[in-house]
Curated annotation (Swiss-Prot):
Keyword match Lyase: yes
GO biological process: 'de novo' pyrimidine nucleobase biosynthetic process; 'de novo' UMP biosynthetic process
Gene coding for it: URA3
Amino acids binding substrate: 39, 61-63, 93-102, 221, 239
Protein name, entry field: Orotidine 5'-phosphate decarboxylase
Keyword Lyase on entry: yes
Length: 270
């Protein structure tokens, strides 16, 4: 499979999605392809970590339903302020997996109102094309052209024993082909193809580590160079940035530099 070796700025020029265009330009201007996964359970720690890591990332990935003291005013509004301060985009890792009408309601409503603040979210392909259509409708109804939204499909996972591989992954790719503008890419471990058909999917990869090989709970880690050389555009790192004994600012810079150098190498700029 051919790995995309174009620069982020070149891809921004030709991409069908306004969200992808914005993300590529942001990555190029900040010189980072790092996404920080902030899985903590209090608003205070959540915002403090994001403020420290913000300068080094292109994306902050949230699991907003983990936060015990969540409120829109105290959690989301400060998050949006930090996104403006540090110039990053927001990815809510919701993993929608229901019929179109249900995911639309989950996306736009409830206490979280995800569509109102998350630039990007994601979904499983298990329920078919309806999940894409439902989320797209939700985005259209709650946002403007000035705040476009994008969707990632879960093609592959980094956990031991994952069922997302082989035929399942290929069928998820077929679902992604149903909407060139709203579906911007995949959560995957490698390039998912599509270039020959005019698609330019962004590949975001979790389970990336510079030090650890696993966590004892099924997570497997691969190196930055390994994932970028096989097609990853954005590396997703969580505990490697702020786990026990780790300084988020030191690790943020370390992972940012490792990811960017791997990208420069892949695109022949280094």
């Amino acid at each position: 499979m051919t790995v995309n070796t174009k620069t982020y700025s070149a891809r921004a020029e030709t991409h069908a999605s306004p969200v992808a265009q914005r993300l590529f330009r942001l990555m190029e201007s900040k010189k980072t392809n790092l996404c920080a996964s902030i899985d903590v359970d209090t608003t205070k720690e959540f915002l403090e970590l994001i403020d420290k890591l913000g300068p080094y990332v292109c994306l902050i990935k949230t699991h907003i339903d983990i936060i015990n003291d969540f409120s829109y005013e105290s959690t989301i509004e400060p998050l949006l302020e930090l996104s403006r301060k540090h110039q990053f985009m927001i990815f809510e890792d919701r993993k929608f997996a229901d019929i179109g009408n249900t995911v639309k309601k989950q996306y736009i409503g409830g206490v979280y109102k995800i569509s109102s603040w998350a630039d990007i979210t994601n979904a499983h392909g298990v329920t078919g094309n309806g999940v894409v259509e439902g989320l797209k409708q939700g985005a259209k109804e709650t946002t403007t052209d000035q705040e476009p939204r994008g969707l990632l499909m879960l093609a592959e996972l980094s956990s031991v024993g994952s069922l997302a591989y082989g035929e399942y992954s290929q069928k998820t790719v077929e679902i992604a082909k149903s909407d060139k503008e709203f579906v911007i890419g995949f959560i995957a471990q490698r390039d998912m193809g599509g270039q020959e058909e005019g698609f330019d999917w962004i590949i975001m990869t979790p389970g990336v580590g510079l030090d650890d090989k696993g966590d004892g709970l099924g997570q497997q880690y691969r190196t930055v160079n390994e994932v970028v050389s096989t097609g990853t555009d954005i590396i997703i790192v969580g505990r490697g940035l702020f786990g026990k004994g780790r300084d988020p600012e030191v690790e943020g810079k370390r992972y940012r530099d490792a990811g960017w150098n791997a990208y420069l190498k892949k695109t022949g700029q280094l």
